[in-house]
């Protein structure tokens, strides 16, 4: 076995001595050594309970006859990091997580690993590591938070963000804001809507890297603990059969993930993460593939922020496997792909049934005939931008309005709360891209403020940054090339007319090309905002959002 290099033979006596210093017996050392990669911490509500998940995983590993060895990686809470310098450090942890797992697994030569993430960047970071080191691996998440309730109405973290805008506009009282603060997040788990964390946890199931149920079983349910034990047992089988991520993560698996993403109306951040994971295996997911899949995939779900349902509702309606089964009725799912169950996708989903067609629409009666995400292009975004079409108000599907230009999320947040944004405006937030930020911050605070003050159906927002999965409205992110690379977004001036046409997938700055070129040439080279530390190194290495913001 792979771990023999650190334990077998007389010359490995020093290594065995170190294992024995931790209390491992000869029998435990002889067995397959399984890394349990945990992201537990006391900072993130989605991770506060992962110690319990890890204990269940380790119990499963021991039941199956192998030896678990746990180590930890970092995890950032995007919600706590939102709206300040801390958000610059969110996306960049994806690479730190992948790199640190690579280092630990290669240094200690584990036979397999179980990955325990839950929140936004931790899931893709761990999947990138699995693809990179390519040893038998399985992912088991912590599970979604339950939705909150105030006055018998469901709510979630996004409700609190939007309430800040409503409070500043005098639309709600101190008591109403406090009630949301107290009740929107009722306990552990990844925030309860189809936000980035839950989207990625659902897609890990679709990719075949997690067991059925991983994306939707609530964090507080005993079924989550049972699933963790099953994952611990399953990794030993994967090691015995030598089933690696490269056997599972094929181009067809990524096509399945994109298809389900479109059906669920998932987070726009998947357009960063799926290409980055694929890149680790030498698979290129370009933006044209994404649009091709979106064009033929019906949108079957409207979960928060696009609708009032939450992940627990999706779970009780049949979960991700039921969505896949529904999509397979029109031949939209590759069925013969291998998964960590040891069975094919088709075998996994054949008995999955939709239990509530209000939550999961039937394939012949979708919310729309095309997917929830769309890539748009035009002279403002030559290399593309992404919008969550399923969360855009109908009257903003096509829009033309004057640009209001800002250099940071904080500037526009303040302008919204002070009433400086008018109906019809097109907000442009630039120098928030991977290099320009650096770190490509999420713009949830500005979009939530727009919703709170009542402008979310009348104002569009365009940025080279990105959006939280909780964002709703006509919000275009990942504009590429970014302003720091002197993309056309750097040339926009206040009052320029911007045209949006989501159905035709265009984003147009109504300024002559010669004038755009003249403006860009007058800017000179971009001066980095950060001159030291990890952010500085990241800004030097990161590529465009159109590539998944990977490092090179």
Swiss-Prot record:
Where do the annotations place [2Fe-2S] cluster binding? 119, 191
**UniProt xrefs under PANTHER family:** D-XYLONATE DEHYDRATASE, D-XYLONATE DEHYDRATASE YAGF-RELATED
NCBIfam families associated with the record: ilvD (TIGR00110), PRK00911.1 (NF002068)
What organism does the UniProt record list as the source? Caldicellulosiruptor saccharolyticus (strain ATCC 43494 / DSM 8903 / Tp8T 6331)
Reaction catalysed by this enzyme = (2R)-2,3-dihydroxy-3-methylbutanoate = 3-methyl-2-oxobutanoate + H2O; (2R,3R)-2,3-dihydroxy-3-methylpentanoate = (S)-3-methyl-2-oxopentanoate + H2O
What are its GO cellular component terms? cytosol
Enzyme class comes to lyase
N6-carboxylysine PTM sites in chain numbering: 121
Output the HAMAP family linked to this UniProt entry.
IlvD
UniProt lineage: Bacteria, Bacillati, Bacillota, Bacillota incertae sedis, Caldicellulosiruptorales
Query: How the cofactor binds, per note?
Result: Binds 1 [2Fe-2S] cluster per subunit. This cluster acts as a Lewis acid cofactor.
Q: Name one GO biological process term.
A: isoleucine biosynthetic process
Q: What is this protein called?
A: Dihydroxy-acid dehydratase
Q: Which cofactor does it need?
A: [2Fe-2S] cluster; Mg(2+)
């Amino acid at each position: 076995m792979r771990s023999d290099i650190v334990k077998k033979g007389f010359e490995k006596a020093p290594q065995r001595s170190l294992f024995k210093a931790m209390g491992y017996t000869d029998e435990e050392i002889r067995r397959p050594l399984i890394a349990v990669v945990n992201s537990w911490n006391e900072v993130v509500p989605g991770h506060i309970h992962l110690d319990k998940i890890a204990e269940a995983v380790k119990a499963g590993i021991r039941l199956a006859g192998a030896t678990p060895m746990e180590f930890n990686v970092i995890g950032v809470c995007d919600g706590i990091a939102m709206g300040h310098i801390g958000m610059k450090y969110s996306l960049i942890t994806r690479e730190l997580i992948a790199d640190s797992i690579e280092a630990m697994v290669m240094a200690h030569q584990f036979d397999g690993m179980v990955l325990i993430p839950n929140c936004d960047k931790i899931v893709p970071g761990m999947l990138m590591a699995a693809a990179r080191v390519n040893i038998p691996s399985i992912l088991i998440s912590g599970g979604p938070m339950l939705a909150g309730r105030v006055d018998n109405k469901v709510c979630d973290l996004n409700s609190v963000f939007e309430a800040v805008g409503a409070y500043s506009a005098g639309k709600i009282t101190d008591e109403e804001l406090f009630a949301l603060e107290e009740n929107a997040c009722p306990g552990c788990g990844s925030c309860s809507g189809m936000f980035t964390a839950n989207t990625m946890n659902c897609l890990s199931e679709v990719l075949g890297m997690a067991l059925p149920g991983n994306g939707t079983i609530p964090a507080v349910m005993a079924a989550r603990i049972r699933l963790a034990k099953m994952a611990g047992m399953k990794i030993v089988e994967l090691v015995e059969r030598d089933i690696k991520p490269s056997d599972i993560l094929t181009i067809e698996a990524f096509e399945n993930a994109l298809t389900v993403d479109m059906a669920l109306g998932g987070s726009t951040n998947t357009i960063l993460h799926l290409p980055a994971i694929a890149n680790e295996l030498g698979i290129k997911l370009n933006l044209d593939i994404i649009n091709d899949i979106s064009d033929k995939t019906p949108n079957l779900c409207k979960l928060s922020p696009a609708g009032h349902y939450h992940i627990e509702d999706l779970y009780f309606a049949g979960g991700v496997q039921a969505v896949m089964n529904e999509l397979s009725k029109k031949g939209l799912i590759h069925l013969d792909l291998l998964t960590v169950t040891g069975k094919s996708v088709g075998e996994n989903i054949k008995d999955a049934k939709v239990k509530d067609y209000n939550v999961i629409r039937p394939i012949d009666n979708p919310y729309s005939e095309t997917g929830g995400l769309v890539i748009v292009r035009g002279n403002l975004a030559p290399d593309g931008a992404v919008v969550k079409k399923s969360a855009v108000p109908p009257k903003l599907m096509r829009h033309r309005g004057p640009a209001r230009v800002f250099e940071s999320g904080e500037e526009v947040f303040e302008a919204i709360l002070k009433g400086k944004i008018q109906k019809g405006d097109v907000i442009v937030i630039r120098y928030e891209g991977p290099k320009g930020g650096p770190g490509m911050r999420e713009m949830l605070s500005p979009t939530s403020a727009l919703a709170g003050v009542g402008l979310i159906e009348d104002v569009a927002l365009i940025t080279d940054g990105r959006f939280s999965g909780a964002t709703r409205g006509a919000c275009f992110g990942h504009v590429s090339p970014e302003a720091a690379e002197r993309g056309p977004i750097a040339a926009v001036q206040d009052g320029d007319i911007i045209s949006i046409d989501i159905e035709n997938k265009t984003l147009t700055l109504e300024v002559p090309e010669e004038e755009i070129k003249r403006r860009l040439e007058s800017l000179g080279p971009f001066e980095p905002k950060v001159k030291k530390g990890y952010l500085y190194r990241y800004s030097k290495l990161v590529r465009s959002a159109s590539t998944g913001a990977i490092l090179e």
